[in-house]
Amino acid sequence: MKKKLIAAILTGAMLVAGMSTSVWADGEKSFVYGTTGYSEEMGDAGLNPHDNYSGWSALRYGVGETLFKYNDNMEVEPWLATDYEFVDDTTVKITLRDGVKFSSGRTMDAEAVKECLEDLIAVHDRAPYDLKIDHIDADGLTLTIYTTEPCPAIINYLGDPYGAIIDMDYGVQGEGGSANVAGTGPYIAENVTPTQIDLVKNENYWGGEVKVDKVTVKSFADGSALTAALQTGDIQGTYGLQYDNYPLFENNSDYTINSCATSRCFFGQFNMDSEIMQDQNVRKAVEMGIDKDGFCSVIMQGRGVPAKAAFPSSFSYGNDAVETVSYDPDGAKKLLEESGWTDTDGDGYVDKDGQKLSINWLTYPTRLEQPKLAEYAQATLKDIGIDVVVNNTSDHMTIAKSGDFDVYVSSTTTAPTGDPEYFFTSTVTGAKNYGNYQNEEVTKLTDQLHQTFDKDERSKLAVELQQDILDDDAFFFVSHLNMGIVTKPNVTGMAAHPCAYYGITPSLDVMYMFVENKILWILCFL
């Protein structure tokens, strides 16, 4: 009623001024959000948290919530839970929040959470190893998890998006990129496709008033199209803007930029089964031939920090704790020469036994800077005599799994749970180890990290593990990224977060009206 009254007053005032208007014609607030971070090729399309990385979308777009979440300092806090206690090394007792309902209408209790977690570990690729769940007891609002072995990071992992609590009685409606679920979040998905999600506010949300009535999430595969949509007003906010497009919106009163440092990193894996890449001198030469400082300053426009290893300097086990090679074209050429690679025919590329040194660089387009990184590396590696053939494809996952590459460059949030373990268990020794890197000591240390409770010891193990993979030249790390959300200035309640899990929240609010296709900002609070 209040919104309709104010809308009517404003409409009348503008009609007196002779201006045509369309002011919240249905009395509702709406918000259109554009992103390059939602797609089938990224593995996060659909809203089923038990499928690949779709839990990220369930959390980001306000449909799902986890038992625990991370604050701005990446410290674990209760969310759907209110407390927890380690009874012993293999038993944790969790108290659940009272008064929470799924969007299906079912009350969330320990039995519902048990059903959800049991389905998760039955079907997910990472969760069983991370959580080590043996069995679960449910009693009212008390959930007791028993693990097969000590699992110090279980509370952190229960904040991973795959841990979004959904109603298994409601089940999963649809498949893959069209999957819909009943969560506990501030929004309910009415329609889900691999390219768009239509949301309405949850009128019975346990966490208070939800301010915006309808939200549309639109996926953009093309960065230029995303930028244009923000400029024309087709969308009101975005995550995933090309970094070289930020100057269009900086120091511009028509937009607001909110950003923060994250552990998201552009990094590469060498294919250890590739004959060329089995030569460590070649791997090291590739690393020494990439100008990380130049990439961060020129391509990233200063919104990235050169990376030594998996974690940024804000972590005690981050960049400053490890050593690796730096940009050194002359040193790279010497390494290649040591392995018999020289330019015998004067074409600018080194060769051996009549074969030019050519590497297959696999990447994908939805992380908009990755193709640019490929082009940048193509140019700098040419300077040391290496030919780079870029395969920039949305089908990168299929190719990565097949092993048809020499270098696979992707991006990941290396510490999304505020703990170092995730990167090693998922990417170095786990399912995302597409380069088939094998090192018994690294596997042993990863297992040790998985069972270590002491935080200082966990940090030491993280440093040792990073140094091992750097010394083996199995991975290389290019840049740690800042996360930025760009919105129209009448949009409030959207903030960048270090783990990039949280986007559409109950705090989101919009104040606007359209006047002859121009937005008149209403600087007031209802």
Report residues per predicted region:
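N-terminal lobe/hinge region of extracytoplasmic solute-binding protein
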Residues: 34-87, 182-183
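Gly/Pro-rich hinge or "lid" segments in bacterial periplasmic/extracellular proteins
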Residues: 53-54, 75, 159-210, 214, ...
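Aromatic- and charge-enriched surface segment that lines or borders ligand/interaction sites
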Residues: 82-123, 276-278
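Surface-exposed binding/hinge segments that line
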Residues: 85-89, 93, 128-170
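Detector for C-terminal structural segments
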Residues: 196, 289-319, 369-378, 400-526
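Ligand-site clamp/hinge motif
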Residues: 203-248, 387
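Structural transition elements
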Residues: 306-344, 365-371
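Ligand/substrate-recognition segments at binding pockets and active sites
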Residues: 342-414
